[in-house]
Structure formats: C-alpha cells, structure tokens
Amino acid sequence: SVIICFLSALCKVNGIHLDPMEMIMTAKAAENQYVGVSCGKLDQSCEVLSKKDHLLYLDTKDDSYELISVNENMKPYKIAIFFSGLERSLKNSKYNLRQDECKAAAYALMGYAGMNYDTFANTRLRDVPFEVFEAYKNRLPELWRRRAEHYYSEFDRAEKGANLWRKGDLEGYGQLVFE
C-alpha cells in the first residue's frame, strides 16, 4: 500500500494519469524489481480497485474483476481493521521460495498431463485445471502437492465466498473467512 500511495502522489504532482491496471502493474514491478519480492498483483489490485460496501472478486489471470455490492438480505455489519503489532517482511521470508514451489508443481503437472507450458517463470497453478491436479497429484513431491492443495482449496474458498456474499449470507461468509 505504501508503493501505491507513493505512486499516486508522484502521478498527482507530475500531472501523470495512470489507469487502474497501469497503476497496479507499476506497483507490482516496483515490488518485484526494487523490493525483491516475487509477488503477484493481488494486494495492489485490492488497493486500487476496491470500493466501499462491495466485495472485490478478482481474477488475476485475465485481470477481470467484479465489484459485488452489499446484498439487501444482509444484516447490518461493521468491519474493524486494526494493527496487531506484528510486522513481517515478505522479502526476508520464504515467500519467494513458496512461490517457486507452486510454480514447480504447476510445471510438473503440465508435463505429466501433456499440456503446453511456457517458461518456468510464467508457469502458474492457475493454468492447471483441478482435474489435472487430481489425476497426477500423487506423482508430485509431498511439499509441492501440499502447496498445490493449498492453492486449490483457497481458489475454491474464494469462489464460495463470492457466492455467499452475492446471496447475502454474511454469517456463512464470516465463517468461511475464519476457516
């Protein structure tokens, strides 16, 4: 979020207009190339595209998104955000290694399935259908399999969360968030 703030300020004082996707991709490039974190664009997309009283449903594969408004069936709610006092630095964590483990799993799965694949750097689990994972997961080293299982479970959780929000099931959505 600091990079988005700095970028917004630099654009404002220099009379530069960046559309939302340019803002997101420029911030991502700064994180990747200057901070040294091999992050995607989820955080930057949330910071740029989010809107009050809406859930941001984002597909980072094709950059499509949907702002799902509050459903009239929802009970009134308040969301509190606070600083826990805990700080973490992705640069000094195993984040980049975990991302490489996910790429390795995707690359292997694509190879096992005879799928066309790109370079290792451009390989993502998002490009591997769940059915391919299910068919070949036992060929993966345990660590890669666990990383892929986590990815697919989170993908499924995001889908379920968006559907619960659309229905106005805030209680179900809240339970899903805390799983």
What are these regions (language model features)?
Residues 1-72:
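Gly/Ser-rich oxyanion-binding loop with an adjacent helix/lid
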Residues 54-179:
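C-terminal nucleotide
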